[in-house]
């Protein structure tokens, strides 16, 4: 059996560009792509923390070290500059891989879209 699992997540990225008349996609700083194990042309889901929008597109490389998160084409209508987004990619994973310890790559970034940490799991949510 295969399960559809979270593979990669870039958490709380700030949108730096919106290019309505670009061909489409989301350009992401190449450093962030590599850290999250997202490859060019891979399908990604984007969840806008500011307005609740959720949509899918594909990743393209943005300039390395730039902090770029550019929503292009129709995706540019789903966010404003400075909105915080979560970028996620999923994979089909065999049950045996899960049992062997398969883990996602979660990347946490700061206000300038620079990497501040990594994790391989989402902590158990508790009441506060």
Swiss-Prot record:
Positions contributing to substrate binding: 57, 73-75
Pfam families: Asp_decarbox
EC number: 4.1.1.11
InterPro entries (alphabetical): Asp_de-COase-like_dom_sf, Asp_decarbox
Active site (UniProt): 25, 58
Pathway where this protein functions: Cofactor biosynthesis; (R)-pantothenate biosynthesis; beta-alanine from L-aspartate: step 1/1
Keywords (A to Z) from UniProt: Autocatalytic cleavage, Cytoplasm, Decarboxylase, Lyase, Pantothenate biosynthesis, Pyruvate, Schiff base, Zymogen
GO MF assignments: aspartate 1-decarboxylase activity
CDD domains linked: Asp_decarbox
PTM text: Is synthesized initially as an inactive proenzyme, which is activated by self-cleavage at a specific serine bond to produce a beta-subunit with a hydroxyl group at its C-terminus and an alpha-subunit with a pyruvoyl group at its N-terminus.
Cysteines joined through disulfide linkages: none
Subunit structure: Heterooctamer of four alpha and four beta subunits.
Protein role: Catalyzes the pyruvoyl-dependent decarboxylation of aspartate to produce beta-alanine.
Protein name: Aspartate 1-decarboxylase
Gene designation per UniProt: panD
């Amino acid at each position: 059996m295969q399960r559809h699992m979270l593979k990669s997540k870039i958490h709380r990225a700030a949108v730096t560009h919106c290019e309505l008349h670009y061909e489409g996609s989301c350009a992401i700083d190449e450093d962030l792509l590599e850290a999250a194990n997202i490859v060019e042309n891979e399908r990604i889901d984007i969840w806008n923390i500011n307005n609740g929008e959720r949509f899918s597109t594909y990743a393209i490389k943005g300039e390395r070290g730039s902090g770029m998160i550019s929503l292009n084409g129709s995706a540019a209508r789903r966010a404003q500059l400075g909105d915080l987004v979560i970028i996620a990619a999923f994979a089909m994973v065999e049950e045996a891989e899960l049992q062997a310890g398969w883990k996602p790559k979660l990347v946490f970034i700061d206000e300038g879209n620079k990497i501040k940490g990594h994790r391989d799991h989402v902590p158990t949510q508790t009441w506060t």
